[in-house]
Amino acid sequence: MTLEEFSAGEQKTERMDKVGDALEEVLSKALSQRTITVGVYEAAKLLNVDPDNVVLCLLAADEDDDRDVALQIHFTLIQAFCCENDINILRVSNPGRLAELLLLETDASPAASEGAEQPPDLHCVLVTNPHSSQWKDPALSQLICFCRESRYMDQWVPVINLPER
């Protein structure tokens, strides 16, 4: 490995960490503004009704989910729809960390403590535009820029690893 290759790899890792941090910030704000949709079927419904309002789509799966044929078909359809409608899309490689981020907020709600139901489907997460000027967010801009640059390099669905805390 040459010095240039080592330096390039180090820069890529640092950039991915920054993108992961930006994604955490976007999800945190989306949760607080209630502009988030969780679940494959719920996401498909929203994409069917109001695709112009969706600013980011996250797909999350681990190794076990890679063998779920039905889930992979849903992912393929959602990816195709997002690409056709210019919706930024990312794949999250550690759904456990995504669950920590999203369930932290929902566990605090009174509805979460009423019944111990099945855990929510976190395989697909949509972030929508809140129709406010507050959404001029540098973290979201960073994610959109990352998605655009990835598409230029023919990586239509870039994979993000959320940093562990």
UniProtKB/Swiss-Prot annotation:
Indicate yes or no for the key word RNA-binding: no
Disulfide partners: none
Keyword Methyltransferase in annotation: no
Where's it found, cell-wise?
Answer: Nucleus
Q: Which Pfam families match?
A: Ribosomal_L7Ae
- A biological process from GO: DNA damage response
Residues bearing Phosphothreonine are T2
Kindly state which keywords UniProt assigns to this record, in alphabetical order.
Cell cycle, DNA damage, Growth arrest, Nucleus, Phosphoprotein
Which residues are the signal sequence here? Answer: none
Describe the task this protein carries out.
Might affect PCNA interaction with some CDK (cell division protein kinase) complexes; stimulates DNA excision repair in vitro and inhibits entry of cells into S phase. In T-cells, functions as a regulator of p38 MAPKs by inhibiting p88 phosphorylation and activity.
Name the family the entry cites.
Belongs to the GADD45 family.
Subunit structure, as described in the record: Interacts with AURKA, PCNA, GADD45GIP1 and MAPK14.
Protein name per its UniProtKB record: Growth arrest and DNA damage-inducible protein GADD45 alpha
